[in-house]
Amino acid sequence: MPKTKKKDSSSDSDSGPDDRIKPASKKAKESDAPNSDPKDSGENGATSWTLEGLRQVRINEFRGRKSVDIREFYDKGGQILPGKKGISLSLIQWKKLLEVAEEVTRAIEN
């Protein structure tokens, strides 16, 4: 037999899912500007284009090498920060992607 017993709760409140406060859902604001217009992020001078919501294509430079970053961003206290979901392509990989883009489009449509 256990030495200690659990105290019975005499509380009338139920701590079930009904009592939990649900956080307000955040919806990404769509910009009124056309998607093809580049915008300057301001922090590091990277040029970016909005794909949808908070998904963006950015041109970054790291250690003297440029890359194309396709990434999902998130809003933290009014500051837009890069998320984990995304890919960074070298310029060679980006050019190869553009070469096969038409074939990929045809495969999607068929």
UniProtKB/Swiss-Prot annotation:
GO cellular component, one term: transcription regulator complex
Single GO MF annotation: transcription coactivator activity
Location(s), subcellular: Nucleus
Record region (Disordered): 1-50
Key words of the record: Activator, DNA-binding, Nucleus, Repressor, Transcription, Transcription regulation
Any single GO BP term: positive regulation of transcription initiation by RNA polymerase II
A Pfam family the protein falls into: PC4
UniProt keyword DNA-binding, yes or no: yes
Biased composition (Basic and acidic residues): 17-42
Protein function: General coactivator that functions cooperatively with TAFs and mediates functional interactions between upstream activators and the general transcriptional machinery. Binds single-stranded DNA. Binds specifically to the NssBF element, a short nucleotide sequence of the 1731 retrotransposon, to repress promoter activity.
Similarity section: Belongs to the transcriptional coactivator PC4 family.
Protein name, per record: RNA polymerase II transcriptional coactivator
Species, as recorded: Drosophila melanogaster (Fruit fly)
Lineage, top ranks: Eukaryota, Metazoa, Ecdysozoa, Arthropoda, Hexapoda
